[in-house]
Amino acid sequence: MENSKLSDRARGIDLIVYDFDGVMTDNRVVIFQDGAEAVVVNRADGLGVAHFRDLGIPQLILSTETNPVVKARAIKLRLEAITSCKDKKIALKSYCAQNGYDLNKVVYVGNDLNDLEVMKIVGFPVAPADADPKIKSVAKLITKSKGGEGVVKELSDYMMGS
């Protein structure tokens, strides 16, 4: 990605991919009597997403969840989302091939074991502070923020050299 506003860290990124639960949320869910679920997100992450969008960096949410809250948040953030994904590695490889993205130029933010294999194939794996230790072991960046506490905003600040 060529853009004069990009820092050296952000230059060359083809795509940023986020897991949802445990990255944009604190991994907790509220279940109502009717079975509906709700999560809490951090508005600062919305600022991080907007910053990357303003710089022209494509972004994607990739989740195994079937919960409609993931799609609702993606719509609010104006992000594409792949949900109900059985194998994130296969899904991301396919998505990148279809869209001409180089996996070596992909940033992937994940927190749990279902992110491990996909994090091994991207160029820049990122983990929240409270990620599973196996995830942290493959991450090139571990944020100071825990999941749901501004991980995406912190990544945005880091990529822009702030």
Can you annotate each of these PLM segments?
Residues 1-20:
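Non-catalytic pre-domain segments flanking phosphatase-related domains
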Residues 19-21, 45, 111-115:
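Acidic active-site catalytic centers that drive phospho-/nucleotidyl reactions
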Residues 12-14, 57, 104-105:
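Short coil/turn segments at beta-strand junctions that form active-site/ligand-binding loops
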Residues 42-49, 66-71, 84-95, 113:
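N-terminal active-site wall of soluble small-molecule enzyme domains
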Residues 24-54, 64:
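A positional/architectural concept
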Residues 35-39, 81-82, 89-162:
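Mg2+-dependent phosphoryl-transfer enzymes with acidic/Ser/Thr/Gly-rich catalytic loops
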Residues 23, 49-73, 82-83:
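Substrate-recognition element of Asp-dependent hydrolases with the DxDx(T/V) motif
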